[in-house]
Amino acid sequence: MRTLGLDLGTKTLGVAVSDEFGWTAQGLETIAIDEERGHYGFERLRAIIDEYGVDTIVVGWPKNMNGTLGPRAEASERFAAKLREEFSLPVVLWDERLSTMAAERMLIAADVSRKKRRKVIDKMAAAVILQSYLDSKR
């Protein structure tokens, strides 16, 4: 079974999936969403969950640097509750502080153009979040 990693934004949802052993995370795709209208791409997520045999979902939880919860962390909590209800799978909120910055640094180091970075940053951030979670399980 595999673990799904998600990085929630207001307009996009970064998606990553673990390998079958739960050792590595791979960025999969970015799904266009509309958080204000409550459209979270659940149809596509269901297809991914079924295709990869996902048994756990990890959602990035963007705490403030001092550990407090701001509006984005609260949005992630609401999203996690919707995921639990929709998919009946365990959902883990995982501290994602600096994950997008780490993903950005990796892409810059790989000499990825700014235009291409914009297209892949969300799925890369999801992979960073998921890899952090997977590493904690070993």
Swiss-Prot record:
Domain of life: Bacteria
EC number: 3.1.-.-
UniProt xrefs under CDD domains: YqgF
Pfam family, any one: RuvX
GO molecular function, one term: nuclease activity
A biological process from GO: rRNA 5'-end processing
SS bond partners: none
Keywords: Cytoplasm, Hydrolase, Nuclease, Ribosome biogenesis
Locations listed in the record: Cytoplasm
One GO cellular component term noted in the UniProt record for this chain: cytosol
Function per UniProt: Could be a nuclease involved in processing of the 5'-end of pre-16S rRNA.
Annotated family: Belongs to the YqgF nuclease family.
Name of this protein: Putative pre-16S rRNA nuclease
Organism whose genome encodes this protein: Geobacillus thermodenitrificans (strain NG80-2)
